[in-house]
From Swiss-Prot:
EC number: 5.4.2.10
Protein's UniProt name: Phosphoglucosamine mutase
The protein's role, per its UniProt record: Catalyzes the conversion of glucosamine-6-phosphate to glucosamine-1-phosphate.
Keywords of the record: Isomerase, Magnesium, Metal-binding, Phosphoprotein
Cofactor(s) required for function per UniProt: Mg(2+)
Annotated GO biological process: carbohydrate metabolic process; peptidoglycan biosynthetic process; UDP-N-acetylglucosamine biosynthetic process
Binding positions (Mg(2+)): S104, D241, D243, D245
Species whose genome carries this gene: Renibacterium salmoninarum (strain ATCC 33209 / DSM 20767 / JCM 11484 / NBRC 15589 / NCIMB 2235)
Residue ranges that the Swiss-Prot or TrEMBL entry lists as coiled coil: none
InterPro entries for the chain: A-D-PHexomutase_a/b/a-I (IPR005844), A-D-PHexomutase_a/b/a-I/II/III (IPR016055), A-D-PHexomutase_a/b/a-II (IPR005845), A-D-PHexomutase_a/b/a-III (IPR005846), A-D-PHexomutase_C (IPR005843), A-D-PHexomutase_C_sf (IPR036900), A-D-PHexomutase_CS (IPR016066), Alpha-D-phosphohexomutase_SF (IPR005841)
Catalytic activity: alpha-D-glucosamine 1-phosphate = D-glucosamine 6-phosphate
PANTHER family xref list: PHOSPHOGLUCOMUTASE (ALPHA-D-GLUCOSE-1,6-BISPHOSPHATE-DEPENDENT) (PTHR42946:SF1), PHOSPHOHEXOSE MUTASE (PTHR42946)
Amino acid sequence: MSRLFGTDGVRGLANGLLTAELALSLAQAAAVVLGHDQLAEGKRPRAVIARDPRASGEFIGAAVEAGLASAGVDVYDAGVLPTPAAAYLIASLDADFGVMISASHNPAADNGIKFFARGGQKLADDAEDAIEAQLKVKPHRPTGVGVGRIQRFSDAEDRYILHLLTTLPHRLDGLTVVLDCAHGAASGCSPQVFKDAGAKVIVIGAEPDGLNINDGVGSTHLGPLQEAVVANGADLGIAHDGDADRCLAVDHEGNVIDGDQIMAILALALKADGKLKDNVLVATVMSNLGLKIALREAGISIRETAVGDRYVLEAMRQGGFNLGGEQSGHVIFADHATTGDGVLTGLQLAAQVARTRRSLQQLATAMTKLPQLMINVKGVDKTRAQTDEGVREAVARAEQELGQTGRVLLRPSGTEALVRVMVEAGDMATATRICEDLAEVIEKRLALAV
């Protein structure tokens, strides 16, 4: 059987790959692996569970709760909450582990199960492997007083909101903010916390019905937010995805502010306050070169990682850094959160607008994005992308031409016979020409036999 765990837990079509039976079995296996220390002492481990509002979350969540309780785990059901809220509650309650039922930015038909370790930390690969291995072992099934209890956690959202408010460096009084909640998990808490922080709030995409999550709204569909910001004369707009672990923004003229620009604004603010640990930002190789150039001029260095927030988190933990993220809008404030938090990020960004009395558009000029083009070259031997002599020579020529004003990145797909070619340059014409030339070389040199 292929590995169940992907880059962000177990995810797939609800009632297709992700059945109630699998959810129950995964929960029983996780109870043994993540609750081992408590079970070994004859105690009941404690776990927090939350979900986004997609319809399938109810039966999958019920199956997970049944699996946990039947394996001797006391369950605290936090209901519909963002993924980062679940992580926060796991840490604040000192629970042994937690579970989030969500497929993030995926369509409503999909769902997922993501486990967190003690402290609200993402699971290491070896812990996921151990859970998969435990699926093949007879479940731990206590009886009598050994079975777990299930409790509804009535003030979970309030606790999360209070936590977010304590992180604010400045209130939002006088700001008008449009929030697009993607008909997702932040539909309740995000508008409330922005109001509590003093902003005038206009809300779209906050009427979840179980089937409309991410449907034409949210961080993957920014059109409605752009229109609402301009139509209402708002200062800025904030877009979440289905589980609110990411944030993209829109300035007062409707221009998109991506994760790189958000990180630039926040890194500079933290450095100015003397709060950016070691003056380092952690970002992935996909972040725009303009981010590195702007921060280097400000005395901030970037630690690059592979693509994926788990790699950003790993580098942050290893180096003790407190700010990192991705161009997609996953931004991690290690001083306040253990994972990407879209509501927290939106609050911090809005606070800088209020604090500096500069528009988001003005703040975003902190970095100049280099024109960037990506081409997916399909049907090629991706394993040779870094070793083929002809490809290496073509890349070297491109890098020599670009010099310090651009870069080339080849990324083999993890799941397909495909190589992604990304080029940044001082102008789009140059980026396009070089990217197309490299794609042609890769297609010719690495083509798979038909």
